[in-house]
Every structure is written in C-alpha cells, then in structure tokens.
C-alpha cells in the first residue's frame, strides 16, 4: 500500500479552513472521487452530514465537484454515519459520502466514503482518488453534468431499519430511558426509535446549533447523562457521538458502560440465544477484563489494530459477526455493515428486557481492570515513538507490571497525538506509570 497524502484511518479530517478541509479542496475531492467512481457504472452518490455549521459549505463544494465529473448527488440532510451506509446500500448508489468529524469539536470536519455495499472504501479506491487529485479538473459535457436532489424520507427509512433490528416479540414498555445525542446527527432519529418501541424517553443534547456538537455531551463526555439518569430515576442512559457511530451507556446507578462492556453483553446474549457465530473482535485498546470474561464463557477473542475499519477487516478475515472498540464503535455484521450506536443500544436493551435484568446486572460478569489513557500532543514531523528515551521508559514500566498488565503506545490516526495506555491491577500504580511514559513523550515531543 502506497503512502497516503490525504486519507487517514477514517477518511479525510482536519480543521475547517485549513488544508485539506477547504471549499476548493473538497470541490476537487468531489471531482476526483466522481472520476474514479464513474468507472464502476452507477452515477448516483448519497451525501449525508452531521450538524456542524461547516457541513452546508462542504456539501455544496462536494456537489459541484461530483456534478463536474458527471455524477448526481442525493442529499439526506443531517443523518448518522451508519444511516448513510444503510441508504447507500438500499438506493444501490455507487458510494455514500459522510461529512463529519465524528466525536471532534465543531470547528473540525471531515469526509469519509462508503462503497456500494455500505462498507468503507477499499484502500485501492482511496489511492485512485488521491491519484486523480494530482490532475487538473476537467468538466464533462454540459448534457452529462450531474444533478442534485434531496431524499425527503431518509430519517423515516432509517428509523424503521433500526426498529427492525429489535426482536418483534419484545418492546420497551415501562422502561425509562435518557438519550444524549451530542447535539449531533442522531438528534431527530434516536429519540423516535426508542419512543416508538414503547420507552419513556428523556432527551438531552438534541438541540443542535451548528457549533455545540460534542460540547460537554455525548459519548465522549457522559457526565451530564450520568447526572440526568440519577435525577430522573431512569433505567438506562444512552450517549451517541456527533455522527452516531459510537455509543456509551450509563446504568441506573449512574455508572458508565463502555464499548468493551457492551460487546460483552451482546456476545453473551448471542451465545445464550444460540446465535453466536465464531468469536468476538476487540482492539489493542480493549480491556483485559473483556478478554478474561469472554474466555470464561468459552467465546474466542482476538485483537485488531485500533480503528473500526481494522475491526471490520478482522471480522471478515475470521468470518465472525461481533466486534467493538472500547470507545463505543460496535460492529454487528448480522445487522449492519459499520459501527451503529442506535442498533448496538437496541441489542443491549433487548438483553435487558429478555432477561428481566438491569444494565448494571448484565455487566456484573465482567470486571474491568484499571486502564489509564493519557493523550500527549506533539509538534513537528518526527515520531516520538521512535525515541530511545520513550522506548526505554515503556520497557521499564512493562517489566514492573510483570505480565499482569499491558503498555500500549500509539499514534492517533486522526490528530497529532500520542496515546499512552497502561493497564494493570492497581489504579494508582498504572496512573503513575502512564504519566511517567507521557512525561517522556512530552520531553522528546
């Protein structure tokens, strides 16, 4: 695979107004993608976005570029990323494009693509798009220019799809649910899904202004959700990120339930129902407690590199159906083609209803080991992870853990960050260890 100039682990992302997230770049990206995708026959593209104010500008730029290449665009308006993947499949479009920076602040944005089957674009297609970017824009003949239209019932279609993943014989009657949509793309979808299935729904983070997405709310900050669940005496809280492909939950005691615990609940329920195919895929960041708990159930577990696309690749390689990141990307291949927060949440609620158990009790079979993550920002083009000083400190910490924990250092695929993770039996000890390594990274970074 050749070195990428623009595409990262999750499409193209950056600060709006800085290269590459500028109107002229995105217009050219639309044209280059159009040229590559037009070779495959279909000339229809689905375009969705989250609630960032910059989405309008970037949507227009993409449309212009695609039209110049002869491709037509169908707009969904604000729509979760997994909804765009679903609509791309059902409309038999050549590709889907999502304008979103997921869990990042409003001033960032990004572009990611889905192929005709609702999965991320293969590497070779992304590389072909990058190659086209180096060429000057040429416009097709006027009669061949692309058109644009809106999919008026996009939200309703996706709501029905989500509800269809919940068992017909069950409902959410009598369940009090707090839903935090991060002022993002699920704001007009998630509350309706849970309400229509019978739950009493209390909403927070459902008033997008274009600049409040992910602002002290949603899957990356559940403090407000925890507070509200306790205040309302709710049975459960569900928090989505800005584009709806992640979920973090909160139990009735106000305790956070992360992606590892959600994967455990769904895998155990699939085993109980005789529907588990193979095992489960986590990542290098998955808690050792998940691995131990699944092993006790006899469920095979393997780790992929961090990033939902790598979880998906590992699932396809193994022929398995369940995978997750602890950050809340849950992939259920018997129901969806990508991480889907709403669908994952429904499977957990289904397990609660079916077993007459609280979320707290469903988690009780798994004990999370203390895991400390420290993000260290770095500048320049050098890689702090190549530093002998950093490597030496990491080696010392690993020796001190003595096989009863893990050290993981990695570069973020979307931001100039080094992520330092230390896991072990004693929280105080692993916190000190993580800070020790982080200090070494800061020193060289």
From Swiss-Prot:
Identify the keywords attached in UniProt to this record, alphabetized: Isomerase, Magnesium, Metal-binding, Phosphoprotein
Q: List every position bearing Phosphoserine.
A: 102
Q: In terms of domain of life, where is this protein from?
A: Bacteria
Record CDD domains: GlmM
Pfam families listed in its UniProt record: PGM_PMM_I (PF02878), PGM_PMM_II (PF02879), PGM_PMM_III (PF02880), PGM_PMM_IV (PF00408)
- Give me the residues that bind Mg(2+), please: 102, 241, 243, 245
Swiss-Prot/TrEMBL GO biological process terms:
carbohydrate metabolic process; peptidoglycan biosynthetic process; UDP-N-acetylglucosamine biosynthetic process
Concerning PTM, the database record says: Activated by phosphorylation.
According to UniProt, the reaction catalysed is:
alpha-D-glucosamine 1-phosphate = D-glucosamine 6-phosphate
Provide the active-site residues from the annotation. Answer: 102
Cellular component (GO) terms are: cytosol
The note describing how and how many cofactors are bound reads:
Binds 1 Mg(2+) ion per subunit.
- Cofactors required: Mg(2+)
Q: Which GO terms describe its molecular function?
A: magnesium ion binding; phosphoglucosamine mutase activity; phosphomannomutase activity
- Assigned EC number: 5.4.2.10
UniProt-listed InterPro entries: A-D-PHexomutase_a/b/a-I, A-D-PHexomutase_a/b/a-I/II/III, A-D-PHexomutase_a/b/a-II, A-D-PHexomutase_a/b/a-III, A-D-PHexomutase_C, A-D-PHexomutase_C_sf, A-D-PHexomutase_CS, Alpha-D-phosphohexomutase_SF
Return the similarity comment.
Answer: Belongs to the phosphohexose mutase family.
Main function:
Catalyzes the conversion of glucosamine-6-phosphate to glucosamine-1-phosphate.
List the PANTHER family: PHOSPHOGLUCOMUTASE (ALPHA-D-GLUCOSE-1,6-BISPHOSPHATE-DEPENDENT), PHOSPHOHEXOSE MUTASE
What name does UniProt use for this protein?
A: Phosphoglucosamine mutase
The encoding gene is glmM
